[in-house]
Amino acid sequence: AGALMPKEEKEVLFKTSRMDFKDLYDDLKNLTPATGLSTILDVMEENNTVYAVEESEKGMTLSHYLHLRSRTLTPAEARTLLQPIMEGVAQLHRSGLIHRGICPDNILLPIDGTARLTGYGTLALRTGGSELKSQLYPGYAAPEQYSAAEFSGRYTDVYALAAVCYKMVTGQTPVAAPQRRVRDSLESAHSLEAGVPTWFSQVLACAMRLDPAKRMQTV
């Protein structure tokens, strides 16, 4: 009683998605607690599905924090705030995991002040054109995530982290990747906010290149 039953024609997709979800959260449970990552407390199989228990934190999202601010952050402020997130992403990468959903909505600023990354998702959930309804974050999702024919990698998280930093120092969400592929109208951070040093602006631009091979490859 209470077991989740997929539609007959979706049974294979359901089983595959369930396995992918369990594998991901088992790995996250083994990895956390870790600096900059929201902790997975337990993973359970019941009712023909899988449940993951994630630590609940009091605080606000980075998105909400930026909305409340009256000015943009300086590059130094942005780096300080994102430092634990970068450490967490580096931990994911060393463990063979890729987040694929880094954005202001998935960065939590707890009351204790140490930012944590949440919003974990499977590959299929973070890939356009997959059999699942994808959950991508325009402006932060890398171009390769919009096609099932392209491969995401550590460089995908590099793009998203740079996009988040761009938002923090300019106050503007980056142009979404599909639009950039048609006409790349992404303005440099320095041109939008004169207080952003040219070198810092160039680092962000490099990390947000449309071609994954031309970006930094990891954090």
Question: What kind of region is each of these model predictions?
Answer:
Residues I85-L97:
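Protein kinase catalytic-loop region centered on the HRD/HxD motif
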Residues N47-T61:
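Conserved short submotifs of the Hanks-type protein kinase catalytic core
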Residues L62-L73:
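AlphaC helix of the protein kinase catalytic domain
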Residues L81-L82:
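Activation segment signature within eukaryotic-like protein kinase domains
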Residues D42-V43:
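Activation-segment/catalytic-loop signature of the eukaryotic protein kinase fold
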Residues Y25-T35:
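Structural motif at the C-terminus of the N-lobe alphaC helix and the adjacent alphaC-beta4 loop
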Residues A1-K22, D26-D27:
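ATP-binding glycine-rich loop module of kinase domains
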